[in-house]
Amino acid sequence: MAKVLVLYYSSYGHLEVMAKAIAEGAREAGASVDIKRVPETVPLEIAKGAHFKLDQDAPVAKVEDLADYDAIIVGAPTRFGRMASQMAAFFDAAGGLWARGALHGKVAGAFTSTATQHGGQETTLFSIITNMLHFGTTIVGLDYGHAGQMTLDEITGGSPYGATTIAGGDGSRQPSENELTGARYQGRKIAETAIKLHG
């Protein structure tokens, strides 16, 4: 059975919700799925003052965990058009995995959230995807089999490069059903690819 890791960072819970939807899709495909988050690097008092969601269920990942999976689906919110520093710091600590080729041939994908519709979703996805390509993974995006990313009757996330959500400038907007459907779809497609490649 293919093993899938959904690895995410979320300050306010939007990507926690998306991670759970991605995991649902991967499980529907028949994969064994774990959800983990990267360590918070913001000092606790500052995180509390900024009202970060600190009670997230997912255990904190260790860099070495990545080698145990057939597929790794990575989610991080945008920070000025690139992945949040918490996720970047996690990857920066993974040089040992890169040096020994521990992730070569694994399947990977990316998902993100932004404050606005044009707030850097695709550049953030590319910042994650670039890292995963350097680690030797095979990238699976959100193909147009998820027709919801073509809709024009609502403001919605979704890109061929990965599932996305729009949080709103004050973080009050939660992932829509269309965005969650896209996340489940991408999770399923990545798991199906991992099953084909790794059994």
From Swiss-Prot:
Domain Flavodoxin-like: 4-190
Entry's Gene Ontology cellular component terms: membrane
Enzyme Commission numbers on file: 1.6.5.2
Gene3D superfamilies to which the protein is assigned, alphabetical: 3.40.50.360
Cofactor dependence: FMN
InterPro entries, A to Z: Flavodoxin/NO_synth (IPR008254), Flavoprotein-like_sf (IPR029039), Flavoprotein_WrbA-like (IPR010089), FMN_Rdtase-like_dom (IPR005025), NQO (IPR037513)
Name of the protein: NAD(P)H dehydrogenase (quinone)
Organism name: Caulobacter vibrioides (strain NA1000 / CB15N)
